Structure formats: C-alpha cells, structure tokens
Regions:
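Active-site cofactor/cluster-binding pocket
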Residues: 2-236, 240-242
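Thiamine diphosphate
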Residues: 13, 20-102, 240, 247-352, ...
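Metallocofactor- and cofactor-centric catalytic cores in central/energy metabolism, strongly enriched
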Residues: 13-15, 53, 72, 76, ...
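Short, solvent-exposed amphipathic alpha-helical segments in soluble enzyme
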Residues: 42-46, 106-108, 122, 256-260, ...
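A short helix->loop->beta-strand "cap" motif at the edges of active sites that frequently abuts
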Residues: 105-111, 125-126, 273, 322, ...
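Flexible, low-complexity linker and terminal segments
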Residues: 222-230, 234-236, 374, 379-622
Length: 622
C-alpha cells in the first residue's frame, strides 16, 4: 500500500484548526446495491432542513450491484449548488476504492472510514476518524441479514455528530424517508443514534468543517429533474406516453405512471390516459406520432441511443408535420458509452435528426423548475407548429436531487394551434392542409373524426403538394421545403428567450457595464458551474464577464446581439466537439464566428466551476 508522509499514530496531527462553516463537499464512497441511497438522502435532507442550501449528485455504475458508487453532497451558504471538484469530507465505506479516494483528497480534508480499512497510515495531512461499523450495527440490529443495509445509517449519525448536524433533523429526515414503514424507520433511527453516540464518546473533533443552522431553505423543496418533468407533462395535458426503458430517462416515465394513476383517473374509475411500453425506441416514437396525428398530446422519454433509433420517424413527423414531445435525458456516448454519466452530447444530432433537410425545436432546461415549466411550453410549441419538440435534459439534472422553490400552478392555457373545426370548414368550404395562408409557414390541420366532408386529407412522408396530394414535381417539393424553413424561422419568436446576466450584478438581466468585453454562453446544467465561475473569475483574476444562458434552439435575436456586443465569447458545454458552438456558427454572420471560443468538459462528471475558471483565465492570459 502506497503511503504519503505517514502520520504519527494516524491522528492527522493538528489539522483543521480553521473553522469552515456551511461550505463543504461531502462524498460517500460505497458499493452499489448496499442500501446507501436512503442514508445519503437522509444526510442531504437533514442539512437542508437546517436551512443550508444543498445539492446531491450520485455517481453510480451501470450494473445492478457490486461496483463502486460515490454520492456527493454539497452544502454552501452562498447558494452555489453546482458540483465542487474538491472533496472536503470523505466517508470511505468501500475497500476497493478507499485508497484511491484518500490519495485524491486535498490537504486538510477529513476522512471517516470503516475501522478494518486502516486508512490512517496513508497520509499525515488529512484528518482521520476510524469507526467500527460492524460492532455498532450489531448492537441495534439483531437480524444479521439486515445489518448490511442498516450499517450505512450508522455513518449518518457519526457525520452528524462530527459536523454538528442536529440529530433532531436527522430523525425528521429518517421519518420522511421511511414514512410508510414505521419499523424500518425505528431501526434506521436507532442505527443513526448509535453512530452519533459512538462519535460523541470516542472521536475527538479535529476537522475544520461544521454545519450551522441558517435560513436559506425555508419553503423550498428537494426534487429530481425527471420527477419535475413528469409532473410538468401531466399538468401540460399529456394523455399518451410511449416509451422503452433506458437509463437515465426511465424514471421520468416511471414517475409519470404513478402521478397519472393518482391524479388522472376519471369519475368512472377509468384511466384518462394511455402509457405503453413499446418493444423499442422506434416503435415508441411511432406511437407518439400516431397519437399526435389523432389529436392527443403525446410524448416519449429516451436517451442518446434511443434518439439515434428514432431518426427515421423524426423525419416523418417533421415532413408530415405532426406534433409530439421527446425528452432526451442525455448521457455519455457514442454507442453504449457510459450509461450512468452525464453529457450534453446529443445537441447536433437532435437539431437535425433524420436524413435530408430537417430542423427541430429544442428546449434546454437548467433546473427542476424549468423541467416543470418547459413541459407545457414544449407541448404548446409542438401543436402550434405541428412538429416534434425535443426537451434536452441530462443525467445530472434528471436523476439527481436539486433544491428549488415550489412550482407554480400553471395558468397559461393549452395552445392547440391551427386546428379547424366543423364550423370552420363550413365557413371555408374546404382547406389545403399544407397551404401557407398566414405567411408564417404553418398550415391548418383537422383532427380525425371531424364531421365534415372536407376534413379528411392524406398524411404522407413522401412528396406532396399543399393539398397533401402525392407529387414529385420539383416546384411542389421546393415550395414545401421552403415553407417548412419559413415555419422554423417563425418559431424564433415563440421559443423561450435566453437569460442574460451582465456585469457584477449577476442577479439582474439589465445590470452591468457595456464595457465588458468577455461573454460566456452556456446551457442546461452547465449554468450552475458558470454562476460560480463568474464570481471566481471576478474575485481571483479581476475578469468581468457577461453571461447568456441559452434556453432554446432556434436562437433568438438576443443571442446574435450578445455576441456582437463582446470581443470574445466563450461557449461552455459538456461535449468534445463544441456542438452548440457549431450550431451558433451556422446561425451567425461569418464575421461574428471569429469571436467564439470553446471550453469543453467531457469526463462524464457534472461541470464544476473551477474547471471553467482555470481554462478561461488561462485563455485570457492570466
């Protein structure tokens, strides 16, 4: 076993005298399938209940059980909830990774470890705490088969005592976690209390990190992005969901099933929705298109491999002009890639998904709140413009826990777009399905079952004229494609506008100085790293930046204006090939493209502020 400056008696010396309050990253290293998820959630929630802003990130393997898992809790008094690169307090429960985990820490960090691991001989610039977990759990859990699961709750109690997390909040979190299982709650509470008592009696506090009560989480909730998206889709009026299970999107539909069963049952006791597990992703999007053609609000959820399989039907929906919503919870590719790691690698593929000339609307949420609100926006846009709308989430947002204000009840009415009724057809005497009467590229449609002889039309993915009749005439094809492009251009005025933060006052879209020469463009969950990085750049290097967060494609006028106003614009994204930057170049005047710079992050971990700060400051010559 390699060593680094062996510590006398493994005590960690006199480290940690500086008191660091409500600013730390706690990492729990365990084995997948060991029951640590409940313990980690309890620890996260206990800190949250003490009024301290938190976020939780689960780094787990793509197997059922047995491989290493890391769960990171960030607590930050200033409200930074992006990933912190440095680990301040390590709970080492996995013998396989313990040595590497310890050796990767910065000096001054604390390590809580299972006594048999003997980690305190590795380094003398860390604070070590040894705990006999098996001995402690045996005193509170008579059933040996349960000890493996309850053992994790012991470290919750130990951490609570060492960081001064109130045990009353730990109990509340346990009661909430096991709300329907009183016996399990009592057993886990006993384990946590035993850990707390052991730490109080046997461990001398030497670390620097503390949790103290604040008042920055009052009225807030903790929820993952997939659950927020499922709730948003239900409120948006979605009635047909078709899917094929794939990580990390499966939990979106699984949660939606539970919501719909509870809230979308009619007075007669029958479901007012249909959720179908298809045989594959191609079948799933085919059902979405069929339901959308029939007038239902329909959707599917998938990830990159599913997006690839959906390509042919995506082209059909684009060309035949049928509405539908697709949630892409992005993960690392290509191919199978890293199924349980996060990415923003589907941007280019999705924007032009299918062969031929296609362009798709993309909405890009950065928060659980936007997962909820963009669901309604996606369905409205899909029906208004009779096309697919892709909501580009990612694993970090979809599967991790985020702090948020409660969602506001939707008040925006459902927008069905240009749908002709029997009465409309009576007045018109007929209609041409793909004729651009209003100059916006959007034709009028009818729904199956409309009782009028002029209502029917033939839906096809082959060449057609404005009356939907089959045609191979060059002018019909060219006119149709130009109209589709005109429709896409019209959407620029309807998609969510970007969020712009200027100058020193990052909280106001109208604040700041016009003299700032450096701009940053980012999107999705990269936002949380950028918020923190801008403060680091200002405080450490004197670099002032303006920031634009993209929320949709196609780009609006504000995006062009932002680039024009800055000498250098850094496009930060979580993929190798600068995919969003490539989209921007296609959209910009050639002379503006030279202002763009790329900062790429592609290791599968959520973007952290320090990585952005280091790279941007270096590129600026600092």
């Amino acid at each position: 076993m390699a060593t680094m400056d062996v510590a006398p008696q493994g005590t960690g010396g006199q480290l940690g005298r500086k008191r660091i309050v409500n600013d730390m990253s706690i990492q729990v290293a365990t084995v997948n399938g060991s029951g640590s998820q409940s313990s980690n959630t309890v620890l996260l929630r206990a800190i949250f209940q003490m009024g301290v802003p938190v976020s939780g990130k689960n780094l787990f393997p793509s197997n059922i059980a047995g491989l290493p898992t890391w769960y990171t809790i960030r607590a930050n008094k200033d409200g930074y909830i992006g990933r912190k690169k440095e680990i301040d307090f390590l709970v080492a429960m996995n013998a396989e990774t313990a040595q590497d985990d310890v050796m990767s820490l910065d000096a001054g960090a604390s390590v809580l470890y299972d006594e048999p691991l003997g980690l305190d001989k590795l380094r003398n610039d860390l604070v070590f705490y040894s705990v006999p977990y098996d001995k402690i759990v045996a005193t509170v859990c008579p059933e040996a088969k349960l000890r493996k699961l309850v053992k994790n709750m012991v470290y919750v109690g130990v951490v609570a005592q060492l960081l001064e997390i109130e045990m009353g909040e730990v109990e509340k979190a346990i009661r909430k976690q096991f709300a329907t299982k009183v016996k399990a709650a009592n057993l886990n509470l006993a384990a946590a209390q035993a850990g707390f008592d052991h730490a109080k009696a046997n461990l001398q506090k030497r670390g620097a990190f503390y949790i103290e009560r604040m008042n920055k989480t009052a009225g807030k909730i903790i929820i993952d992005g997939n659950s927020a998206a499922a709730l948003g889709c239900m409120f948006a009026g979605c009635t047909v969901v078709t899917w094929y299970p794939i990580t990390p999107s499966s939990s979106l539909v699984e949660t939606m099933i539970e919501y719909m069963k509870e809230y979308r049952i009619g007075p007669d006791g029958k479901a007012t929705f249909a959720i179908v597990q298809a045989e594959d992703e191609l079948a799933a999007i085919g059902m979405v298109i069929g339901a959308g053609w029939a007038g239902a609000r329909s959707m599917t959820a998938t990830a990159g491999p599913g997006i690839s399989l959906m390509s042919e039907f995506a082209g059909l929906a684009y060309y035949a002009e049928i509405p539908g919503v697709i949630w892409d919870i992005q993960r690392v590719g290509p191919s199978t890639g890293l199924p349980t790691r996060t990415s923003q690698g589907d941007i280019l593929a999705t924007a032009f998904l299918s062969h031929g000339d296609t362009k798709h609307i993309m909405l890009i949420p950065c928060s659980v709140t936007e997962c909820f609100t963009m669901a309604s926006e996606a369905f409205n846009l899909a029906e208004q413009f009779q096309t697919l709308v892709f909501v580009m989430s990612d694993l970090d947002l979809g599967m991790n826990n985020w702090m948020s204000d409660p969602f506001e009840y939707p008040t925006t009415p459902i927008k069905r777009g240009k749908v002709l009724t029997k009465e409309d057809l009576e007045k018109l005497g007929g209609f041409a399905r793909y004729k651009d009467l209003d100059g916006d590229g959007v034709g009028y449609r009818t729904l199956p079952g409309t009782e009028h002889p002029a209502a029917a039309y033939f839906t096809r993915g082959s060449g057609h004229n404005d009356k939907s009749s089959y045609s191979e005439r060059p002018d019909d094809y060219e006119n149709n494609m130009e109209r589709l492009n005109r429709k896409f251009e019209t959407t620029r005025s309807f998609v969510p506008r970007p969020e712009i933060m200027k100058g020193a006052n990052a909280g106001s879209s109208n604040a700041g100085s016009s003299n700032v020469k450096i701009g940053i463009i980012a999107y999705g969950t990269s936002h949380w790293g950028i918020i923190e990085s801008r403060d680091q750049l200002r405080n450490e290097y004197g670099i002032e930046t303006d920031y634009l967060r993209l929320r949709a494609y196609p780009f609006t006028r504000e995006v062009h204006d932002f680039i024009e106003q800055h000498d250098r614009v850094y496009v930060v994204e979580q993929n190798r090939d600068a995919q969003m930057l490539s989209l921007l170049k296609l959209d910009l005047k050639p002379e503006l493209t030279t202002r763009l710079r790329s900062i790429s992050h592609l290791d599968g971990l959520p973007l952290d502020a320090r990585s952005v700060t280091d790279e941007l400051s270096t590129m600026e010559g600092k």
